[in-house]
Structure formats: structure tokens, C-alpha cells
Amino acid sequence: MGSKCCKTIHGGIFSKAEDTLVDYKGKYINLEKEFSALSDTESEEELQLEKPLLNKQDSSVSLTQKKLENQSK
């Protein structure tokens, strides 16, 4: 009977989302502050570093096309 009573009280008082984390004392754990930085990981520097890579890929395609043209001659 004790466990059923505790579950009922816990469910009534602490009714939150199903994915809410609770520690051993019954306190809710909010990980939003710790992991908010992970959602915005791409910086402007990283974007600038990616741009030359895209240009290199474009040039490699054109080099491949030139090789094919030279082979067909």
C-alpha cells in the first residue's frame, strides 16, 4: 500500500513532462542551461573555413572535366 500511495502523491504533485529528469531526492533536473550551447555550435569562423573547401571542390570538378576533355581528343 505504501508504494501505491507514494506514486499517487508523486504523480499528483510533480506532474510534469514525461521526459523530465528527477534526481534521487525528487528534485527536477533542468539540463537546458548546460546544453543550450550545443544547439549553436557553428561559428562565423567555421563558416569561413568551409567556403574555401567548397571552392576547392568546384575546381576539382573542373579539373576532372578538363582531364576527360583531353583524353577524348
Curated annotation (Swiss-Prot):
It is a lipid-anchor. This is Cytoplasmic envelopment protein 3. Myristoylation and palmitoylation (probably on one or more of the nearby cysteines at the N-terminus) enable membrane-binding and Golgi apparatus-specific targeting and are essential for efficient packaging. A lipid is attached at G2 (N-myristoyl glycine). It is found in: Virion tegument; Virion membrane; Host cell membrane; Host Golgi apparatus membrane. Interacts with cytoplasmic envelopment protein 2; this interaction is essential for the proper localization of each protein to the assembly complex and thus for the production of infectious virus. InterPro entries: Herpes_UL11_megaloV/roseoloV (IPR020170), HSV_CEP3_betahv (IPR034705). Belongs to the herpesviridae cytoplasmic envelopment protein 3 family. GO terms for biological process: viral budding from Golgi membrane. Keywords: Host cell membrane, Host Golgi apparatus, Host membrane, Lipoprotein, Membrane, Myristate, Palmitate, Phosphoprotein, Virion, Virion tegument. GO terms for cellular component: host cell Golgi membrane; host cell plasma membrane; membrane; viral tegument; virion membrane. Its main location: virion. Plays an important role in the cytoplasmic envelopment of tegument proteins and capsids during the assembly and egress processes. Also participates in viral entry at the fusion step probably by regulating the core fusion machinery.
